[in-house]
């Protein structure tokens, strides 16, 4: 019984240590790599699902005002 508990404990410890090793070796994603959140990128900027230095897209509010201006002319 003791041997079985020790074996299971050692097995779980190895799994935990391997997970820690993978997490510490998993570095951030470089520019151009796919991302979902900013913390995944080295420069902490995820824009349109890609890591970038800064988001090169126009501000959404400015784009919305352009649409309102377009509809106002009709």
From Swiss-Prot:
Keyword terms, alphabetized: Cleavage on pair of basic residues, Disulfide bond, Secreted, Signal, Toxin
Subcellular location, record wording: Secreted
Signal sequence segment: 1-26
Coiled coil ranges: none
Propeptide: 62-74
Disulfide bond listed as a keyword: yes
Gene Ontology MF annotations: toxin activity
Major localisation: secreted
One Gene Ontology term, aspect cellular component: extracellular region
Disulfide bonds: 28-42, 35-47, 41-51, 46-55
Tissue expression summary: Expressed by the venom duct.
Similarity comment: family membership: Belongs to the conotoxin I2 superfamily.
Domain text: The cysteine framework is XI (C-C-CC-CC-C-C).
UniProt protein name: Conotoxin Vt11.7
Organism: Conus planorbis (Planorbis cone)
């Amino acid at each position: 019984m003791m041997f079985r508990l020790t074996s299971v404990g050692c097995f779980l410890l190895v799994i935990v240590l391997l997970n820690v090793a993978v997490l510490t070796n998993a570095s951030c994603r470089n520019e151009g790599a796919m991302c979902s959140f900013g913390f995944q990128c080295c420069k902490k900027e995820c824009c349109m699902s890609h890591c970038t230095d800064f988001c090169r897209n126009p501000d959404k509010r400015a784009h919305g005002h352009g649409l309102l201006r377009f509809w106002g002319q009709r």
